[in-house]
Amino acid sequence: LKEINNTLEILDSNSLPFLALSPTDVDMPCFRSLAWQIRDALTKGLGFCIVDRLPLNDMSNCQAKTIYWLLAQMVGRPVAQKWSDGRMIYSVTDLGKPSGNGVRPDVTNEEQSFHTDNSYNVSPPDHVGLLCLQPADKGGLSRIVNMVSVMECMNEEYPRLISRLFSPYFFDRQREHSVLDKRTIFTPILSEDADGLRVRVSRNLIYQGY
């Protein structure tokens, strides 16, 4: 916490957009060690990590995003969240919009099915982070499932269906692409590479893809 406070104090006196910051710009060895622990949890552990106890009540939203941005870069390489404008940090806020093609579920108040974020993208990110600045008055609960555990259950109860998950499906791309590109991608839910099992799943986008 001391490193966070010292960094914010220095940055507040040297105005710079947080997106222009790099971990090499700050001296935060303990914070960097935390990032390594997070990365290990994501790649070698359960596949998710919750970081709490950050003094968000003592920070402005901009300061919180600054710390989040630095931590994200220490964990991995950030990528754009929207194709249309290259936005690097994307706000998840209920805008009262109805769900449908071209409308992300995270701007609606509808319950989402289990999915991997950005599954419609040609190259989805390795990890996804969420910074909670203001918990919802009601709802907004997050659910997490470990796909390796799902695979173990399927191997016991539905082993013949597993091979289908390694075959391609059509995914609707949510209009996150050039007008000249195809509106769907054809890719498997499961694949494997040198880093292990890769998962790309969204029931709604698969339905829309067909």
Q: Which role fits each region the language model picked out?
A:
Residues 68-79:
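A short alpha->loop->secondary-structure connector
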Residues 77-91:
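A generic structural motif
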